[in-house]
């Protein structure tokens, strides 16, 4: 019997979030094992995995030959190989692409649906988990393993934890936190990722963007010093020739409907509106505010006004918790 996801509640912004335990069903886990795992991943993703410590996790992109991302992966070491978390909607096609050259290497690449993905965030999240686990991850040690459980630490938008565990531990955790924590589903974690400026690549946007268009260079997800990987030439050209004119932005405001991944928005130009950008993700918060993650030109004026197409309501730019200055 699979672990049952929690019923949805309207997500809350990080500043007002009570202690919350989330089931992360919209995300999925995959692994690579075998003697050639590190070498294989080094030739496939934008990050320098050979430099990754056991207690580190990072966001890397897996690109096609043109440097466009199939997906981004939250990557960490796992046994003799690696595990990563990505949006469930892109896992199958991403693994198909990743496996294309695997026949020549000693690796096994597979989806993992045995483990349960949970998120813990909100008021005193660390204190709540400290009662359950003997050690918690932190800024200095971002990945901690305990038995069947791996805990990943995130700083933004406020301290939170992603837990990869077995069904028994997931049930135990739920039982222990049920009284003090709100239960919610993937939408709450999605809202936190949007607020943190972590790019969300779902199926609609797979194969559409180079990593820099989603700020991956600002998140430490691209190494410009490592050897060859698929799409490297285009990713390097975007940096060294200034070919990338796009960036990921956070918008907030009102909208009568939520824009979908892949949709464009409209930018106010004097009295008129002009189509712009590509939506990666959007969530409506419990206070009625809509937050939107969108890829647009990187030279937008900070006071620009946007809207969902033909809508009466407007959206404005919110600051991200990191700098895009290189």
Curated annotation (Swiss-Prot):
GO cellular component entries: cytoplasm
SUPFAM superfamilies noted in UniProt: Aminomethyltransferase beta-barrel domain (SSF101790), Folate-binding domain (SSF103025)
Keyword tRNA processing carried by entry: yes
GO BP: iron-sulfur cluster assembly; RNA modification; tRNA processing
Pfam families in the record: GCV_T (PF01571), YgfZ_barrel (PF21130)
Protein keywords: Cytoplasm, Folate-binding, tRNA processing
Amino-acid positions noted as binding folate in the UniProt annotation, renumbered to this chain: 27, 189
Statement: the UniProt record of this protein carries the keyword Cell membrane: no
GO MF assignments: folic acid binding
Gene3D superfamilies: 2.40.30.160, 3.30.70.1630, Aminomethyltransferase beta-barrel domains
Primary location class: cytoplasm
Subcellular location: Cytoplasm
Role played: Folate-binding protein involved in regulating the level of ATP-DnaA and in the modification of some tRNAs. It is probably a key factor in regulatory networks that act via tRNA modification, such as initiation of chromosomal replication.
Protein family (similarity comment): Belongs to the tRNA-modifying YgfZ family.
PANTHER family hit by this protein: TRANSFERASE CAF17, MITOCHONDRIAL-RELATED
NCBIfam families: PRK09559.1, ygfZ_signature
Full protein name: tRNA-modifying protein YgfZ
């Amino acid at each position: 019997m699979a672990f049952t996801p929690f019923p949805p509640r309207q997500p809350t912004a990080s500043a007002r979030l009570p202690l919350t335990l989330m089931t992360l069903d919209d995300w999925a886990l995959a692994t690579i094992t075998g003697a050639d795992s590190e070498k294989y991943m080094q030739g496939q993703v934008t990050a320098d995995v050979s430099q990754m410590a056991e207690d580190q996790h990072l966001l890397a992109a897996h690109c096609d030959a043109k440097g466009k991302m199939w997906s981004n992966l939250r990557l960490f070491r796992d046994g003799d190989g690696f595990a990563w978390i990505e949006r469930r909607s892109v896992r199958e096609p991403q693994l198909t692409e990743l496996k294309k050259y695997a026949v020549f290497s000693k690796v096994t690449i597979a989806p993992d649906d045995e483990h349960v993905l949970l998120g813990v965030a909100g008021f005193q999240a660390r204190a709540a988990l400290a009662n359950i686990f003997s050690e918690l991850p932190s800024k200095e040690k971002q990945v901690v393993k305990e038995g069947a459980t791996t805990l990943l630490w995130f700083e933004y938008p406020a301290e939170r934890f992603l837990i990869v565990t077995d069904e028994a531990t997931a049930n135990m955790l739920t039982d222990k936190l049920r009284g003090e924590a709100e239960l919610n589903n993937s939408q709450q974690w999605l809202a936190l990722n949007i607020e943190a400026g972590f790019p969300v690549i779902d199926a609609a946007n797979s194969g559409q963007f180079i990593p820099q268009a989603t700020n991956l260079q600002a998140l430490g997800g691209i190494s410009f010093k490592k050897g060859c990987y698929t799409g490297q030439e285009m990713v390097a050209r975007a940096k060294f020739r200034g070919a990338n004119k796009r960036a990921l932005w956070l918008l907030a405001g009102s909208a009568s409907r939520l824009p979908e991944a892949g949709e464009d928005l409209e930018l106010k130009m004097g009295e008129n509106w002009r189509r712009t950008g590509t939506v990666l993700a959007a969530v409506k918060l419990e206070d009625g505010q809509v937050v939107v993650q969108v890829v647009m030109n990187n030279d937008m004026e900070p006071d620009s006004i946007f809207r969902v197409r033909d809508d009466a309501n407007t959206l404005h730019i919110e600051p991200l918790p990191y700098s895009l200055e290189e």
